[in-house]
Regions:
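Structural beta-alpha unit
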Residues: 1-10, 83-118, 156
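Small/aliphatic-rich secondary-structure junction motif
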Residues: 7-62
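Glycine-rich, Arg-bearing micro-motifs that act as flexible, cationic patches
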Residues: 12, 117-143, 153-156
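Active-site phosphate/pyrophosphate- and oxyanion-stabilizing loops and adjacent acidic/basic residues
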Residues: 30, 107, 138
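Solvent-exposed polar/charged
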Residues: 34, 111-112, 142
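General small-molecule cofactor/ligand-binding pocket signal
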Residues: 42-44, 93-97, 149
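A short acidic, glycine-rich active-site loop
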Residues: 61-76
Length: 156
C-alpha cells in the first residue's frame, strides 16, 4: 500500500511553508532553506475570515470590510515571507488564504499543490496557554498526510 506522505518526498513538488511573520516562522524559512536549498516553495499565510470582535459589528458592510482587510494582511504577510525565502535561496511565491481553523487551511493548500512537505515554526506554547489558544503546528502534524517539519524556537 502506498503512503501519500512518502510519495510526496519522492516527487519534485514544492515545499509548503506556513508563515505568520513571527520569529518562529522566519526560523522555519531559514531551516527549510538549509535542508532544501534551491527548492520551489509556496509561503502561505492564513487569516481568519473575521475575528469575534469583527463579527459583532452591526452592518454587513463593516464585516465585509474586515474580511477584505484580513485577506489583505494574509497576502502581505505571505509576500513578506516569500521575499525572505527568495533572499535565503528558495524559489518561493507567496499565497494568502482565509480559513478556519488555520490548520485546515494549511492542509487544504498542501493537498492542492501536492506539497513535498509542510514546514512551520512553533510558538512553543505550553500548559494553559496551549490549552486556550491551541497549537496550529500540532494540529497540522496530527491531521497531515504529508511529512511535517516543525521548527522549534531558538534556544536562548
Amino acid at each position: 500500500m502506498s503512503d501519500p506522505g512518502h510519495a510526496a518526498l519522492v516527487r519534485d513538488a514544492p515545499l509548503l511553508i506556513a508563515y505568520d511573520g513571527s520569529e518562529g516562522a522566519r526560523r522555519a524559512i531559514d531551516v527549510a532553506t538549509s535542508l532544501f536549498p534551491g527548492r520551489e516553495a509556496v509561503v502561505l499565510a492564513v487569516a481568519a475570515p473575521v475575528t469575534v470582535r469583527e463579527a459583532l459589528a452591526e452592518t454587513v458592510g463593516v464585516v465585509q470590510g474586515f474580511e477584505e482587510a484580513n485577506e489583505s494582511v494574509a497576502l502581505e504577510t505571505a509576500a513578506e515571507g516569500a521575499a525572505r525565502a527568495n533572499r535565503a535561496g528558495l524559489i518561493a511565491r507567496g499565497r494568502g488564504e482565509i480559513a478556519v481553523p488555520t490548520w485546515q487551511g494549511i492542509l487544504d493548500v498542501a493537498g492542492e499543490i501536492g506539497a513535498t512537505a509542510i514546514v512551520m515554526g512553533s510558538h512553543a506554547r505550553t500548559g494553559l496557554r496551549e490549552a486556550l489558544e491551541g497549537s496550529v503546528s500540532h494540529e497540522v502534524a496530527k491531521h497531515a498526510h504529508y511529512p511535517v517539519l516543525i521548527v522549534p524556537p531558538r534556544r536562548a
